[in-house]
Amino acid sequence: MGKYFGTDGVRGVANSELTPELAFKVGRFGGYVLTKDKERPKVLIGRDTRISGHMLEGALVAGLLSIGAEVMRLGVISTPGVAYLTKAMDAEAGVMISASHNPVQDNGIKFFGGDGFKLSDEQELEIERLMDQPEDHLPRPVGADLGMVNDYFEGGQKYLQFLKQSADEDFTGIHVALDCAHGATSSLATHLFADLDADVSTMGTSPNGLNINDGVGSTHPEALAEFVKEKGADVGMAFDGDGDRLIAVDEKGNIVDGDQIMYICAKYLKSEGRLTDNTVVSTVMSNLGFYKALEAEGIKSVQTAVGDRYVVEAMKKGGFTLGGEQSGHLIFLDYNTTGDGLLSAIMLMNTIKMTGKPLSELAAEMQKFPQLLLNVKVTDKHKVTENEKVKAVIEEVEKEMNGDGRILVRPSGTEPLVRVMAEAKTKELCEKYVGRIADVVKAEMGAE
């Protein structure tokens, strides 16, 4: 990670860390790096529903116009919507203003290249290098050479049309409950499933600028679980603030995570001959039960570091079509270039419709190992991998496990946290192991 760019773009507390001044520079220098070979390059900008979105959008637009870019504002739209439209509309770049599942005070800026993919480490480092130069030597067009800004709010409809074409058939007879986290999918999801003839019930669809991800969405699926039972729905779909994640709920109110959705879709795609090389790409956070279930179906797996960008890199390198994370970032590379909650929901609905099985039955085919994840607030998250006492306690626990579980300790990519994860035969063992390691992490580098 660089000085400004983390694992998913530039993030921080809006107007404190991520200021309009910084957003202007990110727009100016980021836009230049992505479009320097083009005359009057086209750049798309979308945002989620956070109160700070307008402020940061204005600053970003100013930065882009200052290098002569033609800016098209998409308004409130999901991150994968921006990625899809950037490629579909032959734009030179796309920008999304969002902090995804983070609380409302945070915001972020992430870029997409003209191919719809997130930036490489090299591109991000080049942007940072230019931002940190003592003087700004970028071109400064004047008069008619300055960029212009236009609104293209019809972009959402173009994206919805693409999603509808991804459905194998309509969803007549399926009652779906949607939780849109008061975020970017609040309007999109409702229209999508209604247009596909599903019976739709909604929650988390009343954004007011302040309530995004507040007790709702994919990071709080228990709210949707209650809603599904209350409405008697067949399936529930929970998205996060920017719509790049999906967590599902079955008809009994049980939560179905990204690993389970990936497994269900992988099995279905394999049966249809649409799973390239019968391989799925996942991260080190995926459950042991996920790998065992794939193996039983004759499906291979490739593991990457945590972060959907690393999953996508491995998918592109190997030519694979399905990958994702337990957190609900699922990538169907035949369809879109990044994690897409709405597309993932369509793919899961395809499987439910075509197999005729309820989600509870499909999910039960994968037996999850008990897993516990604890976040420890620390002063310097990057030192955890070098700390000798932390390494020693991890070795002790792994020796005790004797192959019947695993431990993962890693710094968060976006927050000042160390994540301690354990999988074991029982929940009690998970609690014991995680507590033991977390105590050492806290003692060595814990923050107040």
Curated annotation (Swiss-Prot):
Record PTM text: Activated by phosphorylation.
Residues reported in the UniProt entry to bind Mg(2+): 100, 240, 242, 244
UniProt superkingdom: Bacteria
GO molecular function annotation: magnesium ion binding; phosphoglucosamine mutase activity; phosphomannomutase activity
Transmembrane residue ranges: none
Record-listed Phosphoserine modification sites: 100
Matching CDD domains: GlmM (cd05802)
Required co-factors: Mg(2+)
One Gene Ontology term from the biological process aspect of the record: UDP-N-acetylglucosamine biosynthetic process
Keyword annotations of the record: Isomerase, Magnesium, Metal-binding, Phosphoprotein
Disulphide bonds in the chain: none
EC code: 5.4.2.10
NCBIfam families assigned: glmM (TIGR01455), PRK10887.1 (NF008139)
PANTHER family: PHOSPHOGLUCOMUTASE (ALPHA-D-GLUCOSE-1,6-BISPHOSPHATE-DEPENDENT) (PTHR42946:SF1), PHOSPHOHEXOSE MUTASE (PTHR42946)
Family of this protein: Belongs to the phosphohexose mutase family.
Protein name: Phosphoglucosamine mutase
Species: Bacillus licheniformis (strain ATCC 14580 / DSM 13 / JCM 2505 / CCUG 7422 / NBRC 12200 / NCIMB 9375 / NCTC 10341 / NRRL NRS-1264 / Gibson 46)
Gene name linked to the record: glmM
